[in-house]
Amino acid sequence: MKKITILLISLFLSTTLMAAGSDSSSSDTPKASIYDDAVKLVKRAGKLEKKQKLDKAKKLYAKAFSKLEKAYKSDKKNPDILNYMGFTTRKVGNFDQAEKFYLEGLKIKPNHNGINEYLGELYVQTDRIDKAKERLEVLKNCNCEEYGELELIIKTRGSKVY
């Protein structure tokens, strides 16, 4: 009987705590779920890319971009959305547009690690190594993986693009 009582109390507390942690006004909003869906598509596309299924990956990147556009319409001050918009357009080969998204994101958050890394990668891909090194300089003191990844990409002149 004592075990059943403890079990019931535990279940009640865990349910109560889970309910207390959820808020209908938090990330359950449509724009957050659209953004989250886009991020999932980007990750799936990346896995396909690693398997050399490039056409399928590009289709997923394009699909993710469409979702990101919708998310951006309702949250224009989110640098993460702009980062992924730049990433997806870069992955389908639209470097000019990707650069615009990255630069727009940096206007909002100049020290955004992801944007600085990906913009640096774009600069390597478009043979603008000096500009890539500028992005690396911004990341120098971040103590982050983005610094190491961009540094490797610059050293290998893009043969290690992620």
Which stretches of residues belong to each language-model region?
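Register position in tetratricopeptide repeats
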Residues: K50, K91, Q125-T126, T156-K160
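Terminal, low-structured helical/coil segments at or just beyond the last alpha-helical repeat
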Residues: S22-Y35, K47, K133-Y162
